[in-house]
């Protein structure tokens, strides 16, 4: 019978139970009681998620998709591959050890973190050296298998595959080629798979999303011998590709000695023919037809029409699935009582998507009539969405159509603007600033909750937030920062805040997804044409500027990041939606400038994240992404300084496009990579000003002035002092004031030391 399954379920819980349990555990100092409570929470969440999968009608539940912090880190823990610098006993690894690798400790900084392919999820980057070894690791996966079996579930295990695990890591300490470690890694996987078979697991899903990339020949060539070594003694293996087209590797994948393949038909529908043609008779083909990365309801009739010929060709060897893990979507639409009812009919979250998968399986096996009510309801929702008047705004469409190339360019070159800005601001060498946000304290959260509950009126809420702005300005003046920010106390999220104020966006109550660790975000829904009805940030920026003679930056989230960190409508090109958002932001920059704000930061942390996985598609993306930023930023005068910020990015392959943004100042995240990201600037002469991060805000660890000074000096080896800024890696929202106070004081101290050294080195 055709099998219905998913590649993974969100791990955080419908009410973010895992987030809160993790934070209690860390807050309580990882005590025995706190660890028991955390373990109990994890067990309860897994049981609930398996119940949802079973009740939806899936043929098996997925185990191994749960992780305490990150599934890549958990896979390393399973195969004994955590970084050697921590000195952990791989087989006796504790939760405290695991979290130390993720978050750092007094002796070692945290592992580097970067984006999971082109998503907004962040994984911890494996560290590989010539001394790296692998072997038996933690028992967590086997514990989960036992839990699932005890609850009566048929369990399919899921693991990050060995090739992907190596690909995602970084070579250190003289290791030339990560693939050189494959002979050490394969035996660890082989032992793990053999134990899963002994535990009664019939199927193991091996995630190899790197087969959606343009792989070097050496990595392609490694696939067959790797799986020839893994298959004997293992359960049936389902090699899963997702996020893009794997058809260029179709012949290779079909020849692997595994029991099945999974392909993503949402992101790459055209690849289906390449796989179905001459598909091996001994393999199942799992078709990812339900979108694991977006929230729009599946057009079941359309999906059925796509799958029916595959069913005719493969029979029961066709499996129906989500395109990728549901990690990237919220848990359950049932927890959205306040969402607009019409909009709600257009949506499906993880729980609903599990049922869509099962409904498609039922229609293939029993006929559409067996699930006619579900199919008819989905068809009605799709028709209503196509014709709804709330989606289309003729004014917005006319404004987008009227855009010219000149609208996306500043009036003057950078050198002309820089002279005007130096004359206006008179900043010192190596100016210090922050990226934007300051700690979201319990006081801020209480005020926001009281306002949302109607306990605090609007004026009371505004005054509470203004008090937080005053605190932020006073603290920055005490640190001695040169350029200030208002702290963003009024913003619960850098995208959601704007989504609440722009037409064409909708905000959920519990549409949370995991970004990393305990960090969750609630992406807005872009359902229609985007329009700015009134200024969004001018009042806050103007008030903050009134408190100091030093410049205060206006803070906006850029059009590409708004797009990347939202669930975006799928009925028009993303480029069109980006231009609509850019036009709204352009009006906001002009309003800020008119109010006297001389520095405006338009954050684009997701620019690199949006880069297509296929090289052939990147130029087109970068063209419209750069144009959208230009539309947002280019209406202002020469002496208005435009900043931008990017994080978690490898920049080398897109530096020309970053330069084309023509921001006067760019800040980037570099601390965890020890300024390695700046290596690209040795061969590319970046023309404008740059602030490489010198303080890792993702770790509770507080650096001292000596450490920051060392990083500034490293940056000066690549960036001229006249164009170098000093700032943290990212916003400080998730940190505590005691950490921020110490770190920023150290940062200013370090900048002053280096400034003095540079000035003393310049001949009078």
From Swiss-Prot:
Pathway: Amino-acid biosynthesis; L-methionine biosynthesis via de novo pathway; L-methionine from L-homocysteine (MetE route): step 1/1. The active site is at 698 (proton donor). The keyword rRNA-binding does not apply. Zn(2+) binds at residues 645, 647, 669, 730. It catalyses: 5-methyltetrahydropteroyltri-L-glutamate + L-homocysteine = tetrahydropteroyltri-L-glutamate + L-methionine. L-methionine binds at residues 435-437, 488, 603. GO terms for biological process: methionine biosynthetic process; methylation. Binds 1 zinc ion per subunit. InterPro entries: Cbl-indep_Met_Synth_N (IPR013215), Cobalamin-indep_Met_synthase (IPR006276), Met_Synth_C/arc (IPR002629), UROD/MetE-like_sf (IPR038071). Its cofactor is Zn(2+). Keywords: Amino-acid biosynthesis, Metal-binding, Methionine biosynthesis, Methyltransferase, Repeat, Transferase, Zinc. Its EC number is 2.1.1.14. GO terms for molecular function: 5-methyltetrahydropteroyltriglutamate-homocysteine S-methyltransferase activity; zinc ion binding. 5-methyltetrahydropteroyltri-L-glutamate binds at residues 16-19, 115, 519-520, 565, 609. It is an enzyme of class 2 (transferase). L-homocysteine binds at residues 435-437, 488, 603. Belongs to the vitamin-B12 independent methionine synthase family. Catalyzes the transfer of a methyl group from 5-methyltetrahydrofolate to homocysteine resulting in methionine formation. This is 5-methyltetrahydropteroyltriglutamate--homocysteine methyltransferase. It comes from Burkholderia pseudomallei (strain 668). The gene is metE.
């Amino acid at each position: 019978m055709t099998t219905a399954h998913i590649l993974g379920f969100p791990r955080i819980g419908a009410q973010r139970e895992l987030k809160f349990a993790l934070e209690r555990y860390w807050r309580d100092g990882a005590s025995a009681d706190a660890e028991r409570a955390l373990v109990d929470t994890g067990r309860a969440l897994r049981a609930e998620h398996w119940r949802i999968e079973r009740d939806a009608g899936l043929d098996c539940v997925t185990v191994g998709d749960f992780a305490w912090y990150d599934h890549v880190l958990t896979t390393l823990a399973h195969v004994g591959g955590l970084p050697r610098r921590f000195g952990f006993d791989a087989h006796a690894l504790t939760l405290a050890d695991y979290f130390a690798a993720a978050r750092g400790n007094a002796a070692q900084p945290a592992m580097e973190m970067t984006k999971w392919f082109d998503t907004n999820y962040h994984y911890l980057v494996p560290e590989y050296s010539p001394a790296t070894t692998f072997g038996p690791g933690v028992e967590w996966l086997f514990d989960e298998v036992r839990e699932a079996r005890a609850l009566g579930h048929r369990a399919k295990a899921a693991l990050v595959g060995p090739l992907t695990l190596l690909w995602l890591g970084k070579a250190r300490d003289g290791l030339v080629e990560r693939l050189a470690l494959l002979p050490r890694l394969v035996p660890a996987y082989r032992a793990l798979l053999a134990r899963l078979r002994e535990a009664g697991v019939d199927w193991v899903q091996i995630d190899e999303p790197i087969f959606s990339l343009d792989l070097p020949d050496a990595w392609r060539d490694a696939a067959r011998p790797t799986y020839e070594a893994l298959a004997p003694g293992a359960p049936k293996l389902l090699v899963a590709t997702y996020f893009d087209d794997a058809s260029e590797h179709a012949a290779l994948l079909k020849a692997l000695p595994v029991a099945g393949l999974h392909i993503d038909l949402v992101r790459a529908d055209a690849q289906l023919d390449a796989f179905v043609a001459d598909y091996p008779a001994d393999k199942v083909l799992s078709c990812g037809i339900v979108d694991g990365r977006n929230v729009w309801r599946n057009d079941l009739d359309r999906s059925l029409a796509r799958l029916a010929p595959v069913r005719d060709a493969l029979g029961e060897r066709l499996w129906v699935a989500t395109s990728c893990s549901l990690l990237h979507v919220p848990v359950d639409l049932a927890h959205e009582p306040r969402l607009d009812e019409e909009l709600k009919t257009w949506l499906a979250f993880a729980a609903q998507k599990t049922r869509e998968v099962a409904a498609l399986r039922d229609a293939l096996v029993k006929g559409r009539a067996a699930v006619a009510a579900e199919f008819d309801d989905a068809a009605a929702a799709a028709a209503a969405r196509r014709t709804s008047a709330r989606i289309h705004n003729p004014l917005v469409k006319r404004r987008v159509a009227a855009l010219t190339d000149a609208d996306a360019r500043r009036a003057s070159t950078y050198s002309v603007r820089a002279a005007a800005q130096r004359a206006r601001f008179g900043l010192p060498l190596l100016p210090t600033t922050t990226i934007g946000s300051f700690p979201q304290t319990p006081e801020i959260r209480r005020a926001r909750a009281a306002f949302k509950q109607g306990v605090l009126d609007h004026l009371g809420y505004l005054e509470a937030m203004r008090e937080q702005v005053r605190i932020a300005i006073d603290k920055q003046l005490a640190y001695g920062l040169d350029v200030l920010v208002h702290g963003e106390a009024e913003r619960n999220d850098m995208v959601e805040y704007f989504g609440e104020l722009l037409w064409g966006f909708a905000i959920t109550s519990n549409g949370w997804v995991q970004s990393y660790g305990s960090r969750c975000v609630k992406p807005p829904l872009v359902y229609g044409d985007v329009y700015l009805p009134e200024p969004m940030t001018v009042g806050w920026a103007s008030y903050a500027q009134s408190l100091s003679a030093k410049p205060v930056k206006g803070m906006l989230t850029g059009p590409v990041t708004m797009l990347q960190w939202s669930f975006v409508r799928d009925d028009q090109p993303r480029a069109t939606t980006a231009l609509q958002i850019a036009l709204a932001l352009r009006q906001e920059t002009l309003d800020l400038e008119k109010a006297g704000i001389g520095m405006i930061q338009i954050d684009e942390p997701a620019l690199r994240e949006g880069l297509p996985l296929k090289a052939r598609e990147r130029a087109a993306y970068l063209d419209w992404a750069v144009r959208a930023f230009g539309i947002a930023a280019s209406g202002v005068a020469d002496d208005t300084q435009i900043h931008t910020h990017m994080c978690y990015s490898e920049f080398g392959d897109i530096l020309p496009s970053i330069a084309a943004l023509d921001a006067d100042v760019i800040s980037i995240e570099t601390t965890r990579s020890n300024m390695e990201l700046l290596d690209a600037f040795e061969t590319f002469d970046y023309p404008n000003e740059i602030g490489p991060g010198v303080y890792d805000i993702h770790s509770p660890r507080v650096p001292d002035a000596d450490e920051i000074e060392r990083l500034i000096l490293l940056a000066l080896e690549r960036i001229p002092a006249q164009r170098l800024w000093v700032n943290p890696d990212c916003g400080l929202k998730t940190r505590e004031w005691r950490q921020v106070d110490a770190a920023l004081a150290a940062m200013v101290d370090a900048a002053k030391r280096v400034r003095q050294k540079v000035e003393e080195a310049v001949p009078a």
